[in-house]
Curated annotation (Swiss-Prot):
Its cofactor is [4Fe-4S] cluster; [2Fe-2S] cluster. Residues 46-274 form the Radical SAM core domain. GO terms for molecular function: 2 iron, 2 sulfur cluster binding; 4 iron, 4 sulfur cluster binding; biotin synthase activity; iron ion binding. This is Biotin synthase. Keywords: 2Fe-2S, 4Fe-4S, Biotin biosynthesis, Iron, Iron-sulfur, Metal-binding, S-adenosyl-L-methionine, Transferase. Pathway: Cofactor biosynthesis; biotin biosynthesis; biotin from 7,8-diaminononanoate: step 2/2. It catalyses: (4R,5S)-dethiobiotin + (sulfur carrier)-SH + 2 reduced [2Fe-2S]-[ferredoxin] + 2 S-adenosyl-L-methionine = (sulfur carrier)-H + biotin + 2 5'-deoxyadenosine + 2 L-methionine + 2 oxidized [2Fe-2S]-[ferredoxin]. It comes from Prochlorococcus marinus (strain MIT 9301). Its EC number is 2.8.1.6.
C-alpha cells in the first residue's frame, strides 16, 4: 500500500485519486481490515448510531432507477400509499425511539420536493421528531435552495441524497436525473447548514474501478458527508436489476473498510442488504469501520433484520441498552 500507517493517520484528506483508492480497495483483506481499524480507532469513539427508516410516501416515483421498486417504470408489486399524516409519522418515531433508535429517517418516493401542503407537513414532521429528542433525516429527491433553508429552520439534522454509483456507470442505472443534478442537490443541502448523508450501492453491475470512482467523489467532498450509507443491491422482482447476481459479503467488508480509511470521521452506515450478511460478516464490518446501522424491520420497500435480532447481535459484540431501550452504548474494546 502506498500510504503507511503514519500517513493514514496524519490528516484527513480531500484529494484522493481513483488509482490510490483502487489500490486500497484491492489490498489483501486482512491488511485492509487492519488499516481500516487503525483509522477507525484513531478517529472514532466505539459506538454505533441506530437509525430507523420509515417510508412516509411509497410508490409512484417519476424516476427510472433500475434498482427501485417504487419507480413508475418498475413492474414490482409493491403496496403504494399516499403520504402518511403527521401524527402517524410521529407515532412511528416514538416507537423507534423506544426501541433504541436515536435518528429517525423519513423517505418520500418523489423526484423532487414540491411546495405546498405535503412539504408543509414534512416540515411539521421534522420539527416533531426533533421535539422527541431524536435526529431527523429526510430523503425526498431534489430540492431548491429555499426548500433547504426551510428544512434547516425546521431543525432538520441531515438530508440524504445518494450518488448510487460512479459517474461512469451512472447512465446504466438511471437516465431521468443526471449525476450533476445529484451533486447540485448535495451542494444546496450543505449550503443550508444541513448535514449531508450521501453514499451509494454496490452490486449494480459495476466494476471495482467504478466503486473506487464513487468513493473518489465522496471522499473529495470538503467537508466529507457526515453520513455515508453503503448499500448492497437487494434485487427486487419487477425491477430492471431483478436478475442481478448477489454480491459476496467480502465485497461489502472491503467497501466499508475503504470508505473508513478515506473518510475517517464520517458515520459509515451499513445499510440495505444487511439482512443477507451473516452475523460474523456484520461484526467484521463493525470492526473495520461501520458505526451506524438502520434499525427496524423494514427499509422503505425491502426487509431488514428485526429489532430483536439486532438487539441480540449488538449485545453479543458489546452493546448494552438501558431498561427502556432509549439509549445505547457500544463497548468494542475486545475487537
Amino acid at each position: 500500500m502506498a500510504n503507511s500507517n503514519n500517513q493514514l493517520l496524519k490528516e484527513i484528506r480531500y484529494d484522493w485519486n481513483r488509482e490510490e483508492i483502487l489500490q486500497i480497495l484491492n489490498m489483501p483483506l486482512i491488511d485492509l481490515m487492519w488499516e481500516a481499524q487503525i483509522v477507525h480507532r484513531k478517529f472514532n469513539k466505539y459506538d454505533i448510531q441506530l437509525a430507523s427508516l420509515f417510508s412516509v410516501k411509497t410508490g409512484g416515483c417519476e424516476e427510472n432507477c433500475s434498482y427501485c421498486s417504487q419507480s413508475i417504470y418498475s413492474a414490482s408489486e409493491i403496496k403504494s400509499h399516499p403520504q402518511f399524516q403527521v401524527e402517524e409519522v410521529l407515532a412511528r418515531a416514538k416507537v423507534a425511539k423506544n426501541e433504541g433508535a436515536d435518528r429517525f429517517c423519513m423517505g418520500w418516493a418523489w423526484r423532487e420536493i414540491r411546495d405546498g401542503k405535503s412539504f408543509n407537513a414534512m416540515l411539521e414532521m421534522v420539527s416533531g421528531v426533533r421535539d422527541l429528542g431524536m435526529e431527523a433525516c429526510v430523503t425526498a429527491g431534489m430540492l431548491t435552495e429555499e426548500q433547504a433553508s426551510r428544512l434547516a429552520d425546521a431543525g432538520l439534522t441531515a438530508y440524504n441524497h445518494n450518488l448510487d454509483t460512479s459517474p461512469e456507470h451512472y447512465k446504466n442505472i438511471i437516465t431521468t436525473r443526471t449525476y450533476q443534478d445529484r451533486l447540485d442537490t448535495i451542494k444546496r443541502v450543505r449550503n443550508a447548514g444541513i448535514n449531508v448523508c450521501c453514499g451509494g450501492i454496490i452490486g449494480l453491475g459495476e466494476t471495482n474501478g467504478d466503486r473506487a470512482s464513487l468513493l473518489e467523489v465522496l471522499s473529495n467532498m470538503n467537508p466529507h458527508p457526515e453520513s455515508v450509507p453503503i448499500n448492497s443491491l437487494v434485487a427486487i422482482e419487477g425491477t430492471g436489476l431483478e436478475d442481478t447476481q448477489e454480491i459476496d459479503s467480502i465485497e461489502m467488508i472491503r467497501m466499508i473498510a475503504t470508505a473508513r480509511i478515506l473518510m475517517p470521521e464520517s458515520k459509515i452506515r451499513l445499510s440495505a442488504g444487511r439482512e443477507k450478511l451473516t452475523k460474523e460478516a456484520q461484526i467484521l464490518c463493525f470492526q473495520c469501520g461501520a458505526n451506524s446501522i438502520f434499525y427496524g424491520d423494514e427499509l422503505l420497500t425491502t426487509s431488514n433484520p428485526s429489532f430483536q435480532s439486532d438487539r441480540k447481535l449488538l449485545k453479543e459484540v458489546g452493546v448494552s441498552f438501558n431498561k427502556d431501550f432509549e439509549t445505547c452504548e457500544k463497548t468494542l474494546s475486545s475487537l
